[in-house]
């Protein structure tokens, strides 16, 4: 072998240069610098010193013999005649030590340099063996280690040419067949001298663990050596001194070629294979601690008594030996089965030591069975507690929030009150608030209302015809009831609500979807009943009015008549000092159209309209329908944010993903900014007109809120059965505010209408008053019922009746309709309803007077007055007053009323009694006045 420097030697063995120089100095070598050369003799000297320093003998025996004895148990027979037979197997093997080559010496030196501490630990573990054995036994231990190492190599992914684990029938054959390859193959010399040995199997397992650890260390050294050789090979190609570096690489001697045929050099392993080997070694170590013998499954089970950890059980099962297909592991009769693991006979559940307190969420109404489930108790227990509280219910009945709270607290749990709109609140918390969003100016939303015969449709068609750009697809046909118009004053969004059904529903839900209302009135026809309804709707919504006096091109047009009639409805023109703009227009000639749009733009500019854009879209549903081939089609108006295709939309009880959006011209669009009406596809069911829509984060949340709204709507429908009735009009009214009785009045002639309105307005006083939210001449229509439902009013008909649609709607919504034919009867019933809304008057009535004749002392009540009833009767549990010299000095309650030591409830006039006054001392001569408080209904 060529001479190398100290630095190259340190690099080849994977150790530091300082450590190599220190060990050379201890060995007596004269190397001082990393550039000093090291010959083969100096290497052998260093290797011998390292071996002697770690207690290794220089000379080892050439031939050793190993004896092994294995005892197993075999069960024969079946049923009651089963017998147990002990089988003892004895084995004897002879091994010949191989000669140590130069390459093996270098590897051994590398092992000595890298891991002396680990070898010291191994020496310590082996030193625990008793020393009362001979040197021949130590030789047997070394050979046992060699056998175990051979078995480990046989189990590796790259086995050696011969496998010694194959059993043979005769011991002599085993020795003869294994002696020859042992002589031909060089084996690494043992590092640690074994001083003693055990023949017991447990000691063999310990020795196997030590040899296994040694094998892992050798594999690590081989890997490092291979990495070093790869690094040197890469450096050869780049460095300029290729010849010098090539000479520094150690090559095997020529005499080793023959031996290398039989002994292959270990192949460098990847990081994954090293990780698998480390994991397998850890499993084997843990299994070695728990298992005393690996002869059979029964002995594995005896060593694993009551393993509690599941991971330990899995490790033992994986590490326990499995029988091979060829029957190589036949130490027991059932060697092919899994090892029997004994586990501690305990279940994982532990009985709670204390009472568990739950936080029970209680909504506004909850079923008894569901409440019991939330407290983790039986429903019968909840029914018992409710019975103690005086409530008799079944497990399927619902109880209110207060009762459920009392039951939960009485049963020792914590009640958490949940609002009925908790789901809605959580949804709104996930959406960015409008106050925190960026606001931008938006176009005003204009609603055109009026009588159908007054030219409303013609006015809308003229505006669209003149404002829609030429060449637009669908510019003639209006696909939806809303569209946008570009004017010189900006964009305007027009909304058409025929029949006012959508507008009424919007106002009922508090959705302010419109900014300005254009009231169309025909100049030749004047104010009609539907015109009055439009005024009432606009006032209820709180939006400004712009009156368009249409048909001024006709000869019979009279704009002043329209102003006079609307002034009677409190719609005062600006010319007369009011705040309502009147514009004369003609839908046929186009006269006044520009002034009308300018007036609307001016009114919108005063409102300073704005909307957020960087928030989830929200708005209101204009109308919806089922279209054949397209499914649910909904017309919506975006009020805030930007609606995009693909958003998850929630509208009332409907939800779905926006699959397509169509504008008023029939074009498909991808997004819609605020104040833009669009048609959308993708909802599961048609939403109600006036429902507010909102874009939610995910479909699961939309489904949850939709189901909650459906359940809430069913509950509210049941609660509305008592609404809008004269007998219940005073319910929910505040005591300090003026109470209003809303009425929708319909009569047969206008004279009767004016007379009844004047008479009912005079009935009220400072506490109660009649308010006419709607009225007119003619029969009761569906619009009247809708108006009454949204305002909580009572419908009164004088010599008129409701049509079929209005009657069906009133029956379904439990709205009350009253018919009268005599005006005095109508006024008397309304007066009675107003009187019922008045607060009752409290009147005191003196029921008896008792005079104190003497005062006694009672240990239970304190002072007791001996009295004589001089007027009326004295009653127990009624309020009293104590009068001294005809002056009231105390007001309280009677604590006791007795006659001859007996408790009585009443003492008549002229009889004596004992009266105990609570928290007051009376004197002789005082008068005790007993009174009663009664509530008397007031009248107008």
Curated annotation (Swiss-Prot):
Residues 159-180 have a biased composition (Acidic residues). GTP binds at residues 450-457, 496-500, 550-553. Residues 450-457 are annotated as: G1. One of its GO terms (molecular function) is GTP binding. InterPro entries: DNA-bd_dom_put_sf, EF-G-like_DII, IF2_assoc_dom_bac, IF2_II, IF2_N, P-loop_NTPase, Small_GTP-bd, T_Tr_GTP-bd_dom. Residues 496-499 are annotated as: G3. Keywords: Cytoplasm, GTP-binding, Initiation factor, Nucleotide-binding, Protein biosynthesis. One of the essential components for the initiation of protein synthesis. Protects formylmethionyl-tRNA from spontaneous hydrolysis and promotes its binding to the 30S ribosomal subunits. Also involved in the hydrolysis of GTP during the formation of the 70S ribosomal complex. Residues 282-294 have a biased composition (Basic residues). Belongs to the TRAFAC class translation factor GTPase superfamily. Classic translation factor GTPase family. IF-2 subfamily. Residues 121-137 have a biased composition (Polar residues). Residues 441-610 form the tr-type G domain. NCBIfam families: IF-2 (TIGR00487), small_GTP (TIGR00231). The keyword Cytoplasm applies. Residues 586-588 are annotated as: G5. This is Translation initiation factor IF-2. Pfam families: EF-G_D2, GTP_EFTU, IF-2, IF2_assoc, IF2_N. Residues 475-479 are annotated as: G2. Residues 213-239 have a biased composition (Basic and acidic residues). Residues 181-193, 326-337 have a biased composition (Low complexity). One of its GO terms (cellular component) is cytosol. Its main location: cytoplasm. The keyword Protein biosynthesis applies. Residues 550-553 are annotated as: G4. Residues 116-137, 151-196, 210-294, 318-346 are annotated as: Disordered. It comes from Teredinibacter turnerae (strain ATCC 39867 / T7901). The gene is infB. It is found in: Cytoplasm.
């Amino acid at each position: 072998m060529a001479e190398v420097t100290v630095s190259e030697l340190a690099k080849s063995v994977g150790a530091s240069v300082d450590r190599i120089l220190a060990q050379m100095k201890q060995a007596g070598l004269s190397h001082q610098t990393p550039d000093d050369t090291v010959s083969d003799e100096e290497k052998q000297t260093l290797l011998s010193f390292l071996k002697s320093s770690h207690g290794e003998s220089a000379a080892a025996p050439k031939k050793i013999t190993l004896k092994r004895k294995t005892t197993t148990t075999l069960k024969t027979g079946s049923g009651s005649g089963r017998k147990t037979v002990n089988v003892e197997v004895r084995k004897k093997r002879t091994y010949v030590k191989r000669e140590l080559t130069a390459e093996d010496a270098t590897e051994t030196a590398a092992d000595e340099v890298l891991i002396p501490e680990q070898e010291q630990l191994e020496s310590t573990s082996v030193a625990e063996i008793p020393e009362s054995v001979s040197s021949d036994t130590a030789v047997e231990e070394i050979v046992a280690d060699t056998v175990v190492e051979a078995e480990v190599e046989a189990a590796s992914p790259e086995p050696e040419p011969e496998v010694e684990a194959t059993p043979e029938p005769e011991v002599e054959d085993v020795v003869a067949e294994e002696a020859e390859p042992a002589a031909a193959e060089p084996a690494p010399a043992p590092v640690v001298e074994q001083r003693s040995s055990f023949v017991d199997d447990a000691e063999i397992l310990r020795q196997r663990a030590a040899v296994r650890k040694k094998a892992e260390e050798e594999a690590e050294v081989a890997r490092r050596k291979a990495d070093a050789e790869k690094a040197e090979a890469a450096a050869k190609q780049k460095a300029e001194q290729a010849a010098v570096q090539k000479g520094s690489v150690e090559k095997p001697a020529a005499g080793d070629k023959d031996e290398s045929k039989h002994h292959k050099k270990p192949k460098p392993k990847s990081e994954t294979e090293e990780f698998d080997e480390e994991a397998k070694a850890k499993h084997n170590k843990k299994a070695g601690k728990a298992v005393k013998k690996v002869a059979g499954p029964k002995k594995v089970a005896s060593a694993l008594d009551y393993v509690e950890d599941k991971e330990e059980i899995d490790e033992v099962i994986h590490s326990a030996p499995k029988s091979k297909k060829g029957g190589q592991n036949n130490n027991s009769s059932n060697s092919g089965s899994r090892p029997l693991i004994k586990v501690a006979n305990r279940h994982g559940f532990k009985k709670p030591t204390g009472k568990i307190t739950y936080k029970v969420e209680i909504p506004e109404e909850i079923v008894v069975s569901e409440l019991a489930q939330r407290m983790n108790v039986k429903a019968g227990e909840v029914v018992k507690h409710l019975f103690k509280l005086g409530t008799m219910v079944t497990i399927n009945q619902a109880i209110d929030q207060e009762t459920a709270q009392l039951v939960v607290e009485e049963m020792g749990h914590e009640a958490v009150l949940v609002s009925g709109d908790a789901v809605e609140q959580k949804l709104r918390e996930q959406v960015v608030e409008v106050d925190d969003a960026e606001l931008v100016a938006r176009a005003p939303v204009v609603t055109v209302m009026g009588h159908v015969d007054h030219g409303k449709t013609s006015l809308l068609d003229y505006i669209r015809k003149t404002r829609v750009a030429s060449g637009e697809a669908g510019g003639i046909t209006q696909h939806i009831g809303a569209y946008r118009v570009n004017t010189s004053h900006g964009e305007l969004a027009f909304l058409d609500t025929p029949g006012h059904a959508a507008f009424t529903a919007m106002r009922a839900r508090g959705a302010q979807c419109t900014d300005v209302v254009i009231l169309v009135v025909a100049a030749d026809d004047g104010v009609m009943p539907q015109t009055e309804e439009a005024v009432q709707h606009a006032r209820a919504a709180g939006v400004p009015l712009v009156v368009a006096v249409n048909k001024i091109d006709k000869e019979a047009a009279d704009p002043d008549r329209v102003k006079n009639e609307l002034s009677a409805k409190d719609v005062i023109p600006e010319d007369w000092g009011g705040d309502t703009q009147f514009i004369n227009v003609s839908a046929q000639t186009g006269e006044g159209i520009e002034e009308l749009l300018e007036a609307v733009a001016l009114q919108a500019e005063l409102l300073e309209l704005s909307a957020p854009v960087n928030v989830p879209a929200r708005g209101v549903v204009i109308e919806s329908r089922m279209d054949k081939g397209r499914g649910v089609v909904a017309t919506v108006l975006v009020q805030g944010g930007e609606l995009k295709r693909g958003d998850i939309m929630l509208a009332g009880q409907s939800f779905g993903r926006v699959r397509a959006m169509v504008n008023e011209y029939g074009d498909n669009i991808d997004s819609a900014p605020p104040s833009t009406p669009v048609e959308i596809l993708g909802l599961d069911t048609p939403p109600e007109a006036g429902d507010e829509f909102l874009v939610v984060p995910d479909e699961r949340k939309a489904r949850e809120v939709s189901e909650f709204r459906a359940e809430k709507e069913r509950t509210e429908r049941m609660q509305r059965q008592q609404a809008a009735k004269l007998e219940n009009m005073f319910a929910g009214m505040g005591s300090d505010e003026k109470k209003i009785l809303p009425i929708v009045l319909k009569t047969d002639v206008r004279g009767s209408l004016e007379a009844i309105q004047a008479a009912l307005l005079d009935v009220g006083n400072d506490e109660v008053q009649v308010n006419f939210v709607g009225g007119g001449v003619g029969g009761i229509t569906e619009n009247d019922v809708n108006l009454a439902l949204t305002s909580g009013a009572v419908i009164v008909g004088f010599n008129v009746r409701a049509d079929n649609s209005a009657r069906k709607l009133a029956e379904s919504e439990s709205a009350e309709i009253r018919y009268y034919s005599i005006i005095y009867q109508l006024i008397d019933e309304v007066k009675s309803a107003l009187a019922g809304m008045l607060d009752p008057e409290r009147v005191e009535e003196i029921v008896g007077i008792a005079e104190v004749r003497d005062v006694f002392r009672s240990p239970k009540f304190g002072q007791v007055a001996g009295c004589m009833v001089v007027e009326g009767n004295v009653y127990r549990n009624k309020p009293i007053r104590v009068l001294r010299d005809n002056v009231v000095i105390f007001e309280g309650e009677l604590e006791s009323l007795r006659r001859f030591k007996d408790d009585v409830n009443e003492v008549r006039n002229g009889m004596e009694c004992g009266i105990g006054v609570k928290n007051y001392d009376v004197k002789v001569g005082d008068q005790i006045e007993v009174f009663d408080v009664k509530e008397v209904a007031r009248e107008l």
